[in-house]
């Protein structure tokens, strides 16, 4: 096998060009077999095999810097830089990351995970290179989906001032996770039909440069003049009108064409955009036919493409989806907004039922929130459904545009808490802190599926900014017998005891059930509280519990700083300083990839870790 010859960075340079096609086939076969066992991002990686091979052919690692936007499509890059044998532990605890990671290899220039930042990072690398007098190449690879994010345009605007080489590759597969939306998608679609442009332009440029004495001046004039040849053949060339050279489009599965164009791009004195057309899921029919299903997949059967582990109970996203549709039938003002993830956030059915009240704004979380503010001011009730780790990209808009105006915007914060295999960039461990600090914001977390439905109905009837956070995975089915109505700022007592009060938040309620059971088995009589409201605190309940308890234990899947436990602790310190508060939370760290239960134990949030900390506390030892 040709693939076996690649053991370290730049081994690809030893492979003859005629072997690149069979090598691409071997890599695809390896990716399909490997991801079918571990799960991972498949469709995007199958789409960039030839693109990555072509880049590695014209670049030298780690001297040259290759920055992947989002980074989930970097599997072939990892293989070509000597990490093939680590794919058995892809996205597992202590194993190979599903994203570029500088600590993993010097060939990974930038830790990635979120969208639309690669051009900014690349531009920083370019200026550092030039200031330090270095000569390496810097390449940012950004998908057409990521170009729906405004940060990419901020960077393109800034890059236009460059006078030195910077290569920006647009990996255009007409998809983000779901199908792309917006003006840039339409614009790139038009460019796909204009393949003759690049060849014609480069030919004209070379011919003009050969004109004695005035050739270079003619080229400069052509670039600056609005009536230049690009305007005749492709009116409104966005990139060139911004001051960036545009090359393409080129077939992203024709390696010789790409190598030729990439080498041409390396010679451009200034920023250059290379437009590459790829097909998500290429080489594996199930992924090609359904790229959204194979964006991020669990282990699957290669023959059928079916995921091996089927859900036995609905997930929280499913519960949210069904409840929102039901509410949408009753309330014609209810609208739903997603940032390029209608399937992941459970809005597909809402979009089908109420297409005029559904908005996919692209990978543009900041815009999504300010857009929701406008909808609210116009008399509608917007629901913004976004993953916790992505919502943090819009903190200023939530604070300034929604909370400051006290607008009725509902935030459905999906994937809150630990999410597992996607690691540091995707763990939703900060939302309670950044949402709770905002004036006028109300924050809730449900204990089970039914409570999520009730909280969503409460949020629709509420008048003000409100966020409901819920975790990834199966919705908790327990505690159905506890059905106290959701009342503003009120927690729920599941069990009344004495001395120890365990106060759990949302996703940690099942763990709190086990903690209380363990304490009872050890002879204690704990009170068990479902917090429900993280903000505002149920201070009346805290005051009541202070009468016959000496230890409060808060349990949350959020960073300790600014979280529920810290707010409880601050209140008790001010009003009941004799009572100790033990906070079980994520301490000051980024949580790596791994199985959620294993990660909880690793960071001190396991059931036994918390129970033991309670029983070891001074308050209990003194009793």
Each model region followed by its residue ranges:
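N-terminal amphipathic, basic-rich helices that act as targeting or association modules
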Residues: 1-80, 244-259, 275-278
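Structural signature of the thiamine diphosphate
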Residues: 218-286, 408-413, 432-481, 607-623
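Glycine-/acidic-rich phosphate or pyrophosphate-binding loops and their flanking alpha/beta elements
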Residues: 260-263, 295-296, 305, 315-330, ...
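Peripheral docking tails and interdomain loops at the edges
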Residues: 299-303, 307-312, 420-422, 442, ...
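Cofactor-binding active-site loop characterized by glycine-rich and histidine/acidic residues
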Residues: 41-162, 316, 333-334, 338-339, ...
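Non-catalytic terminal/interface segments that mediate subunit docking, oligomerization
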Residues: 65, 278-391, 397-407, 464, ...
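A glycine-rich helix N-cap at a beta->alpha junction
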Residues: 86-96, 161-175, 196-199, 403-415
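Long, well-ordered, tryptophan-enriched scaffold segments
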Residues: 3, 174-320
């Amino acid at each position: 096998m040709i693939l076996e010859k690649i053991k370290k960075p730049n081994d690809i340079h030893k492979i003859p060009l005629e072997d690149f096609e069979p090598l691409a086939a071997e890599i695809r076969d390896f990716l399909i077999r490997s991801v079918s066992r571990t799960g991972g991002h498949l469709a995007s990686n199958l789409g960039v095999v030839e693109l990555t091979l072509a880049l590695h052919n014209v670049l030298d690692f780690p001297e040259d810097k290759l920055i992947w936007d989002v980074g989930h499509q970097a599997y072939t890059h990892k293989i070509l830089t000597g990490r093939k044998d680590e794919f058995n532990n892809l996205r597992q605890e202590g194993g190979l990351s599903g994203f570029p990671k500088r600590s993993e290899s010097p060939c990974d220039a930038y830790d990635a995970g979120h969208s639309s930042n690669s051009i900014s990072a690349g531009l920083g690398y370019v200026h550092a290179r030039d200031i330090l007098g270095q000569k390496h190449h810097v390449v940012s690879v950004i998908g057409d989906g990521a170009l729906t994010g405004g940060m990419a345009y901020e960077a393109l605007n800034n890059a236009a001032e460059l006078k030195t080489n910077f290569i920006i590759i647009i990996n255009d597969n007409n998809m983000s996770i779901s199908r792309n939306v917006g003006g840039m998608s339409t614009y790139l679609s038009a460019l796909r039909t204009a393949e003759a442009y690049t060849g014609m332009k480069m030919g004209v440029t070379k011919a003009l440069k050969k004109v004695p004495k005035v050739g270079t001046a003619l080229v400069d004039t052509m670039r600056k003049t609005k009536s230049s040849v690009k305007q005749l053949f492709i009116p409104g060339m966005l990139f060139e009108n911004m001051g960036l050279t545009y090359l393409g489009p080129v077939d992203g599965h024709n390696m010789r064409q790409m190598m030729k164009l990439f080498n041409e791009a390396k010679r451009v004195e200034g920023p250059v955009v290379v437009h590459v057309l790829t097909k998500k899921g290429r080489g594996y029919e199930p992924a090609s036919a359904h790229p959204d299903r194979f964006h991020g997949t669990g282990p699957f059967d290669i023959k059928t493409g079916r995921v091996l582990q089927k859900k036995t109970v609905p997930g929280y996203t499913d519960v949210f989806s069904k409840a929102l549709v039901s509410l949408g039938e009753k309330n014609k003002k209810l609208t739903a907004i997603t940032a390029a993830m209608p399937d992941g956030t459970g809005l597909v059915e809402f979009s089908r039922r109420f297409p005029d009240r559904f908005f996919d704004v692209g990978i543009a979380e900041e815009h999504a929130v300010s857009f929701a503010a406008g909808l609210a001011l116009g008399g509608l009730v917007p629901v913004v459904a976004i993953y916790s780790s992505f919502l943090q990209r819009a903190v200023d808009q939530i604070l300034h545009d929604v909370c400051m105006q006290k607008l009725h915007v509902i935030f459905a914060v999906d994937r809150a808490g630990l999410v597992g295999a996607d690691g540091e960039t995707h763990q939703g461990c900060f939302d309670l802190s950044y949402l709770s600090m905002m004036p006028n914001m109300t924050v809730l977390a449900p204990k089970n599926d039914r409570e999520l439905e009730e909280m969503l109905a409460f949020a629709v009837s509420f008048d003000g900014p409100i966020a409901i956070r819920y975790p990834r995975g199966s919705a908790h089915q327990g505690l159905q017998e506890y059905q106290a109505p959701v009342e503003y700022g009120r927690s729920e007592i599941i069990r009344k005891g004495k001395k120890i009060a365990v106060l759990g938040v949302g996703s940690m309620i099942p763990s709190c059930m086990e903690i209380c059971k363990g304490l009872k088995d050890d002879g204690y009589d704990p009170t068990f509280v479902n917090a429900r409201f993280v903000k505002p605190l149920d201070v009346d309940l805290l005051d009541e519990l202070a009468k016959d308890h000496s230890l409060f234990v808060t349990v949350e899947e959020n960073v300790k700083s600014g979280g529920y436990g810290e707010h409880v602790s601050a209140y008790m310190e001010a009003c009941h300083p004799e009572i100790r508060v033990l906070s079980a939370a994520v301490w000051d760290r980024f949580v790596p990839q791994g199985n959620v239960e294993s990660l909880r134990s690793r960071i001190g949030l396991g059931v036994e870790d918390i129970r033991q900390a309670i029983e070891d506390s001074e308050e209990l030892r003194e009793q």
